[in-house]
Amino acid sequence: MRTATSILRMNADERGLKYADLTERLIGIFFSIHNELGHGFLESVYEQAFSVVLAENKIFFERQKAIPVWFHGQQVGEFRADLIVDGKVLVELKTGRDIEPAWEKQLLNYLRATEIEVGLLFNFGPNAQFKRYAFENNRKNPRNPRESAGKKSCGGSR
């Protein structure tokens, strides 16, 4: 008998998805948390629950990691990633009725600002929802401040 997990694994492996095993584990963790806690809590509660399960499974993660955004060799902003798992997958957690386009754009911008190529958006709403995103580094604009460090600002405006 094929379970949802085995179908997910087969589909991910057949398509050759980057970090298929890790993303499959994270999706499983998401559903186990949603099944146990349900919906209605703040994002921070689900983030802490995710952290507990990742630690129990000895999966390396960083929580609320500051990620700088660069422009012309200067840092122009930063964001905080909910979770970065094993340095490979950026996880964004939300709580709402449905996944919103703004959340999707947010995650894609986070991927664009990092060397991370895979992102998971988890919505702990009334119906558990997730989306997986891939943004290959060779398709991103340069983010390294040293790549455009030769460009100097005149320091003034017209």
Task: Give residue spans per PLM region.
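Short, low-complexity, charge-dense intrinsically disordered segments
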Residues: M1-L17, R139-R158
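Phosphate-binding site recognition
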Residues: R2-S6, M10-K18, L22, I29-L37, ...
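Nuclease catalytic cores
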Residues: Y19-G28, H39-E43, E47, S51
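Conserved catalytic cores of phosphodiester-cleaving nucleases, focusing on short active-site segments
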Residues: G38, F61, A81-I99, Y110
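Short, well-ordered alpha-helices that flank and scaffold nucleotide-derived cofactor binding pockets
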Residues: V52, E56, R112
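A short acidic/basic microdomain associated with nuclease active sites
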Residues: N57-W70
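A short, glycine/Asx- and small/polar-enriched loop/turn
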Residues: Q75-F79
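Nucleic-acid nuclease catalytic cores
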Residues: K94-P145
